[in-house]
């Protein structure tokens, strides 16, 4: 049992390291909050940019012209960020990850929530 717990804990560390690592081109990943402006104003990840999920297809080109750039998206529960992920992939972005909720994203990336 101890071996299983150790393995699971180690896997979490590896996942966290993978998500906070730099992209293939050596750049930090782009973190996008796909919630509403009101939700953003109540708290968001430090370093994230706000692009609501319903306009991400129109606005993404202003922050990520390179379609190989590593992009992480998050929202309140993971539903809107999953929609945003699908939109970005349809537009040809190749390295998009759904981090789920704001809290999950902050935990996974070891980031700070700014309120």
Regions inferred by a protein language model and the residue ranges of each:
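Bacterial N-terminal signal peptides
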Residues: 8-18
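Boundary of Sec targeting at the N-terminus
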Residues: 19-25
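Rhodanese-like catalytic fold shared by cysteine-dependent sulfurtransferases
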Residues: 2-4, 8, 25-30, 37-70, ...
């Amino acid at each position: 049992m101890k071996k299983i717990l150790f393995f699971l804990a180690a896997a979490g560390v590896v996942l966290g390291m993978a998500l906070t690592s730099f992209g293939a081109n050596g750049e930090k990943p782009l973190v996008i909050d796909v919630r509403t402006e009101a939700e953003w104003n109540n708290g968001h990840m430090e370093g994230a940019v706000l692009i609501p999920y319903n306009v991400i297809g129109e606005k993404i080109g202003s922050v990520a012209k390179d379609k190989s750039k590593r992009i992480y998206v998050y929202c309140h529960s993971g539903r809107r960020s999953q929609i945003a992920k699908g939109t970005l992939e349809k537009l040809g972005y190749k390295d998009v990850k759904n981090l789920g909720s704001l809290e999950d994203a902050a935990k996974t990336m070891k980031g700070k929530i700014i309120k």
